[in-house]
Amino acid sequence: MITLFLSPSCTSCRKARAWLSKHEVAFEEHNIITSPLNKEELLQILSFTENGTEDIISTRSKVFQKLAIDVDELSTSSLMELISENPSLLRRPIILDKKRMQIGFNEDEIRAFLPRDYRKQELKQATIRAEIEGKHD
């Protein structure tokens, strides 16, 4: 099952939700503002990152700049507490399943969450369209 970690006021989060719904992809929504990440969720997210906290912390956020801290120096429990108290520190949306994670909304990258059969069918249709258009040139 896909989990969409979001904040309702975030434009990219709304785009991700709309895209998943439009493509009939089942997902569970988790509002990180009203229900901050627990330790297991944070550890799971971190396990998918290539650059650790650098991938998930929004360094451009007002909260981050106001705190003026080096998150790499924090222990896991301190980081957990900091994110729990300041959920807007996280880049959003975070889209996660058992095999992959995407941070932010990117229409090309989010396609990885479509079932393989769906992607094959779309590729087949695109190929047919390209062949038809090629005959008209």
From Swiss-Prot:
Keywords: Cytoplasm, Disulfide bond, Redox-active center, Transcription, Transcription regulation. GO terms for biological process: negative regulation of DNA-templated transcription. It comes from the Bacteria. The keyword Cytoplasm applies. Disulfide bonds join 10-13. Its main location: cytoplasm. It holds the Pfam family ArsC. GO terms for cellular component: cytoplasm. It is found in: Cytoplasm. Interacts with the C-terminal domain of the alpha subunit of the RNAP. Global transcriptional regulator that plays a key role in stress response and exerts either positive or negative regulation of genes. Acts by interacting with the C-terminal domain of the alpha subunit of the RNA polymerase (RNAP). This interaction can enhance binding of RNAP to the promoter region of target genes and stimulate their transcription, or block interaction of RNAP with activator. Belongs to the ArsC family. Spx subfamily. This is Global transcriptional regulator Spx. The lineage of its organism: Bacteria, Bacillati, Bacillota, Bacilli, Lactobacillales.
